[in-house]
Amino acid sequence: MRKKWEIEEEYRNFCRNNKELALQTLRELTLTPTETGKEDQRIAYCMEWMKQQGMESVHTDELGNVIWEYRPEQEKKVLYTAHLDTVFSLEEPLEIKEDGMIWRCPGITDDTVNVVMLLMAAKYVHETEPELPCGLIFAADLGEEGLGNLCGVRALVDHYEKNLCGMAAFDLYRDKMYPICIGSVRYRISAKTKGGHSFLNFGRKNAIAELAGLIGELYRFQTDAASHTTYNVGKIEGGTSVNTIAQDASMLFEFRSEDYRSLEACETYLEQTIAARQSEEVQYSCELVGKRPCARETDPVQMARMTRCAQKTLKAADGEEPVCSEASTDCNIPLSRHIPAICVGFCRGGGAHTREEWLDAASVEDGMCAAAALVCRLPWMCCESRVVVRDGIEDRKEKEEIRRLLELCDQDFVPPLSHRNSTSQTNWAETEEKTDGIAEYLENICSQHVVLWKEEGVVRAFMTWKDHFNCENLEAYPDSCYLTTLCVWPDYRGQGISEVIYAEAEKDIAAKFPGSRITLRTWSTNGTQEHILDKLGYSLVRRLKDDRGEGIDTVYFVKKEENDR
């Protein structure tokens, strides 16, 4: 029987049979010149390549994005992108230097090899025609680098936005993935003065000095450390000669942040600072040259499921799970419009944006397997879902769905839920099988607070909790909010859903019972739950040895607070 995330043999066979094609495509595409805004040669290459592989419906949009759709008649779609531009110019000398399986060439990993992964994944889908819950869009897009301003993915999302249920950008390296995006705002700021001779007109305002003064003020801005907000002057120009009071000077300046509110605060500070410095002697202008938006609120469960799916698929391909990080990528655009999106790289390499850029070509085959598997798995993580918070369970349909979930999960608990008297039972010797123990347990939790997770309207996971809870085993934490039951449909486990439900419950508790401690208990052989609790910042505060049978302890946890030692 296949393990949950294992790479199926059909993916492996495809990649073995097409490895040489992938490497040859990589060589040819790497040596095809490209530049942001001048991607024409690579556009032509990808169009011809896809047609040769039988994807006759491949086309370009008005901007030049190369697009092939699988099952275009489907209303819902998942978008996959990889960018055709690099940071280098068309005149950059391109030569692949092969040292065994280490290949060196400008642009080979950012993002050429990921374009090849996109092409090969599209070829796999075209040839195997998998059954999926939605259509797929494969797009080799434009303008990702520098001041390209993400123009390619902007055009794609503008066109498909109402149909998109998720997106993945193929970019960067194998060791990390990026479910968090960094937004940026980039300006060309200029200062103009009357200027003059450095000796004869000494005392007049100097545009360079005034610009330096502005930089000093901008660098005094207090950023929000929690949102990873930064600023930078990247280039300064101006002046005429050593004996001239500069009439003009300009600089390129940017703010970056992962939080849109922080980025808006930066923009406001810049506008106010420049306005305060304007005078008859010094005129400032501020031109917006690039803007990459931050993420807005997106479905947290969908984001968690997509992230976990990518991590586990990549790990199954070659044994290493990528670490989650943050970056500015194609994903900025969908995330800014509430569309779940992740950025994933498939091959090992380094030296991005340098002439020493390198690729471990030995990682191409495993990367191809991961890419082919991921494009077929992610759509199942992108179904419409939502988190619902209630102060009790009254809806008949929800009750029926929760009962079904309890029945499925019953034997996963120690002791089974159907044998229990209540959610706060402490005498486990009194547990016994009942005629309809699930109905009794359901009735017990119906009056509790509940967080439901629904996929396409059906409850697939839930957590219940009590307020003002007291028991002798938690006497150090009186009137706590006590998490009683967490159930996740078996087919949906291991996808990050539990962590999101915990977060939603904690948010609900903080809003309704500020200052209350959060407590819970489980059993000592429930390793999966204990791993989640450790990850989410819960501390073990009491252990009752052999409380639920020989070798099975009852363990109590409390959510850590900042002042906890």
Description of each model-found segment:
Residues 391-396, 400, 404-491, 508:
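Acetyl-CoA-dependent GNAT
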Residues 1-10, 179, 200-384:
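Metal-dependent amide/peptide-bond hydrolase catalytic core
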Residues 499, 524-543:
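Conserved active-site alpha-helix within GNAT-family acetyltransferase domains
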Residues 111-182, 254:
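Acidic/histidine-rich catalytic neighborhood of metal-dependent amide-processing enzymes
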Residues 75-137:
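Active-site metal-coordination/substrate-binding segment of hydrolases
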Residues 509-522:
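Conserved GNAT acetyl-CoA-binding A-motif
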Residues 493, 519-530, 547-549:
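Conserved beta-strand-loop-alpha-helix junction that forms the acyl-donor binding cleft
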Residues 25-28, 34-76, 97:
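A non-catalytic alpha/beta surface segment that caps or lines the substrate-entry region
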